[in-house]
Amino acid sequence: MHCAKCLAAWLLIPVFAAWSQATPPAEKNWKAVCSAAKQAPVRQPDLAGPLRPSQLPDCHVQQWYYGYGIRKPDYAAALQCAWYGRAHADPSVGDMFAGAGTLTMLYANGYGVPRNYTLAIRFACEEPWAADAEQEFRLGHLETMRAGRDTKPFDLCDDVTSGLNMGACQAVSTQQHTGSRQAKVDAEVSNLPSSAKSLFLALRGAEKAFEEARAGNEIDMSGTARGMFYEQEMDTLAAQFLINLQRFHKQDVPVATAADLQTLDGKLNAAYQQLMKVPASKWEDYGTIKPEGIRETERAWLKLVDAWARFGHEAYPQVSETSLRAQLIRLRLHQMQSLAKMLAT
């Protein structure tokens, strides 16, 4: 079994790392449960605020529910947004959090409304993008909570089994990290000399271009879990960018001589050439990962290294350009070697 396909069995287990702690009991008769749950009419409550009616068409329910970008959750706003989303559902958009999805969480947890498991189950049954296995686990989870055997907060991501919804959950996890990470980046930049600050925007742009190239070209995007893998890689790269800022600031990188740099550069070039020489037939087993994508990513990385060198000269004069470039090469070499190892299996 090739590496690009070895996660297939794992993807069927509802153990999304950021949320789920144990596999819940499954409701094998979930279709009958849902059929009964949908019989009772549901009336939207009168909601006075805090969002104005004009804000509802563009509201982002995940932002209000999870609180990323606004410091803390606002369940009253999430409730408004979710009810609006349910009333204006777009069946062509695969968003499990839209409308009924977030209503499931709000009513299951009693966030912004009295806890109501009957409604939570009803809304869970309205989710059109959930796999059958996902519904078995989700309905079983809610029934376990209603019976008082599970008191932990409920989240849709506890029970995901499909690649599509794993991607949605990873996107939430990434967004939750982004706010705190950005605050740390801002803190690193705030004390830099103005000459460095003027170069930071260009560095950030080069970093973004590399992150998108790396995640889009060197991670297999062919499976249903592609969204999750893409978001995971973007999160990893963003975390590494912050680590780089912190380590260069603290001078916490190995001192490299010109000879060291030449050796590392030679290793990187050898790894790159090895990948470029892999027969075309070999790449067929690895989905969207192709030599041309690696080449595009490498070009973006070279621009990023140059941007780091210009920025580092002003921001970290105590760190030699040789040491800075060597550290960046080490990180890229690890990525190249991981690709080569994948192809060798």
Regions found by a protein language model. Give the residues of each.
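Bacterial N-terminal signal peptides that target proteins for export
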Residues: 1-8
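Hydrophobic h-region of N-terminal signal peptides that target proteins for export
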Residues: 10-21
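N-terminal alpha-helical modules
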Residues: 21-345
